[in-house]
């Protein structure tokens, strides 16, 4: 979770982000296509599906920040919060006031309730940064680094959170796509135009941007998923025949999606320049929502095994990878 540059100002409320309704499939154009490995599991789709689930969480953690203030509550600058305090006193104060908005409190509360040792370690990091002169932007950056260090070793627990955990991660992915759509746009041209403007980047990554509420909500959800799966029994990551059939049905349905048809058509052309122009027009948000829509309709058991497969072994990766 990466939060933006330090700034002296405080944030303002942001609207809740609601993902658009799923794409309707009625009346979709019919195309004749060849399907590789038609009689068995499509490994490419499995990798893509698992990637949507796992990367969705990473995308959420990478979102920038905003402070949601309730009523007349005053948010004190961090330098005032820790003024004259020793390290232990600063930890107590920051537990209350580092992120005093509703989403920030919910995240810290979930962490303290489910992982008290990790909560204390995070407060150690925040206290050190605050007493070294860091403002809330600096604290948010520390939370971003800490989040990666927390999530990676807990991926196996998240992988045991079952079909509900699978759907929760898909919801996070849908919200992340909505954030991209609202902030920058979903085609290559729009994304490039957005990132090429330093003012846009500074605004999107600064303390007070629209994504803080989403980021804190996502962090709390990941903490709760890890807590839910921590004591759950292991889930088999071996696909069954019914899983292969369910996934192949989803693959065939996706082939009728407008964005994916455009992607396949562009890849099949011989003209490189024409391919690039076609690819730049593809709406990655619409394509992502189509994939999420299909994945949500997989059978309960398939979701469980797909999540277990997608997280298997990832908890052994270094946190910086």
What role is predicted for each listed range?
Residues 131-136, 233-235, 300:
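Charged, low-complexity interaction regions
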Residues 24-40:
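Juxtamembrane low-complexity tails/linkers enriched in Ser/Thr-Pro and polybasic
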Residues 69-70, 255-321:
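A cross-kingdom marker for long, charged
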Residues 36, 79-83, 308:
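Intrinsically disordered, low-complexity segments enriched in small/polar and acidic residues
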Residues 174-271:
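Extended amphipathic alpha-helical interaction segments
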Residues 44-64:
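Hydrophobic membrane-insertion alpha-helices, especially the h-region
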